[in-house]
From Swiss-Prot:
It is a multi-pass membrane protein. It is found in: Plastid, Chloroplast inner membrane. GO terms for molecular function: antiporter activity; proton transmembrane transporter activity. One of its GO terms (biological process) is potassium ion transport. PANTHER family: CHLOROPLAST ENVELOPE MEMBRANE PROTEIN (PTHR33650:SF2), CHLOROPLAST ENVELOPE MEMBRANE PROTEIN-RELATED (PTHR33650). The gene is cemA. It comes from the Eukaryota. It catalyses: K(+)(in) + H(+)(out) = K(+)(out) + H(+)(in). Its main location: plastid. This is Potassium/proton antiporter CemA. Belongs to the CemA family. Keywords: Antiport, Chloroplast, Hydrogen ion transport, Ion transport, Membrane, Plastid, Plastid inner membrane, Potassium, Potassium transport, Transmembrane, Transmembrane helix, Transport.
């Protein structure tokens, strides 16, 4: 009975790990959501919601087009046929840029919708499988309890160095950048640098409070070993 329960719990754990990937892959091959987003974006009332980076990009592009038009007016010695070709080129470039902007916005909405749907399905799945989650939690607690204090201290030290250590900002930048990309958002250095400079500090404060309140009470020897290894 225990083996069967453990096997079911392992299947549940594998489902939690691979379910978001499977949902994302399903929407990639099934074009229904993409068609709905395309239809909604192209038929909705025209409303532009832009962040500062997008506004700067759009402004820069239109300034370039305006400069090109002014340059066009300065070329009075050109023949009318050549000037007409230049106007057509500016028009085609504008249309192409608008299409690229629309595709980018559709891509953002599609990725964001896919991730929200994955989160909702995963949450419902976790609630319905509460018994397996409790069993996995008990197995994890038993596994951690059986570890020696030295192994526990080493694991805590390794985890803290990875999350809030000297080289951790590079890892946070990569992780936040990949989350941004996964949700379809444009790369934003200001937000990423803001999160990287504040979030590890918050984690460090929470971790120190956890050592002070919990580990000192449960396992003082573990705290002594941890501080010895850390020094």
């Amino acid at each position: 009975m225990a083996k069967k329960k453990a096997f079911i719990s392992l299947l549940y754990l594998a489902s939690i790990v691979f379910l978001p990937w499977w949902i994302s892959l399903s929407f990639t091959f099934n074009k229904s959501l993409e068609s709905w987003v395309n239809n909604w974006w192209n038929t909705r009332p025209s409303e532009i919601l832009l962040n500062d980076i997008q506004e700067k990009s759009i402004l820069k592009k239109f300034i370039e087009l305006e400069e090109l038009s002014l340059f066009d007016e300065m070329l009075k010695e050109y023949s009318e046929r050549r000037l007409q070709k230049l106007h057509v080129g500016v028009y085609n470039e504008t249309i192409q840029w608008i299409k690229m902007h629309n595709e980018g916005r559709i891509h953002t909405i599609l990725h964001f919708s896919t991730n929200i749907i994955s989160f909702v399905i995963l949450s419902v799945f976790s609630i319905l499988s509460n018994e397996e989650l409790i069993f996995l939690n008990s197995c994890l607690q038993e596994f951690l309890y059986n570890l020696s204090d030295t192994i526990k201290a080493f694991s805590i030290l390794l985890l803290t160095d990875l999350c809030i250590g000297f080289h951790s900002p590079h890892g946070w930048e990569l992780m936040i950048g990949s989350i941004y990309k996964d949700f379809g958002f444009a790369h934003n250095d200001q937000i990423i640098s803001g999160v990287v400079s504040t979030f590890p500090v918050i984690l460090d404060t929470i971790f120190k409070y956890w050592i002070f309140r919990y580990l000192n009470r449960v396992s003082p020897s573990l705290v002594v070993i941890y501080h010895s290894m850390n020094d």
